[in-house]
Regions:
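A glycine- and Lys/Arg-enriched "phosphate-lid" helix/loop adjacent to the NTP-binding pocket
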Residues: 97-129
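Hydrophobic anchor at the beta1->P-loop junction of P-loop NTPases
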Residues: 9
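ATP-dependent small-molecule kinase phosphotransfer cores
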Residues: 31-95, 120-121
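P-loop (Walker A) phosphate-binding loop of NTP-binding proteins
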Residues: 12
Length: 129
């Protein structure tokens, strides 16, 4: 493992990126950055509110700016939002500069986790089914 590269946690919504990222950073004595949390603090809105009030395009533009900034931080663990890796610029930059770790779970596990969390912006209707 290249000890000079950041660790970036990727995965679908509900895969545990934030939880595992925090624990991994603590274990490795590194700083931890959750890009969704950083965006929420910056805009003073929850991710679901940003989607609702400003739309996904605006959110993805903001996400891109934040993620690219944090990919350049020295030696840290970064949790990306569930859809961040879809962006080609983010994906290429992360693959070039970081060690990317995909957290993979079954669809059933992800859906069960997401249904328990009312803050998930793209799947709020799952709770009604």
């Amino acid at each position: 493992m290249d000890s000079k590269k950041n660790l970036v946690l990727l995965g679908m919504m509900g895969s545990g990126k934030s939880t595992i990222g925090f624990l991994l950073a603590k274990k490795l004595n590194l700083r931890f950055f959750d890009t969704d949390f950083i965006i929420e603090k910056k805009v003073k809105m929850k991710i679901s509110e940003i989607f609702e009030k400003k739309g996904e395009v605006e959110f993805r533009n903001l996400e891109k700016k934040v993620v690219l900034k944090f990919l350049n931080k020295p030696l840290c663990v970064i949790s990306l939002g569930g859809g961040a890796f879809i962006n080609e610029v983010i994906r290429k930059e992360a693959q070039k500069k970081c060690i990317c770790i995909w957290l993979n779970w079954s669809s059933k596990t992800l859906i069960d986790r997401i249904k328990k969390n009312k803050k998930r912006p793209l799947v709020l209707n799952l709770n009604n089914n």
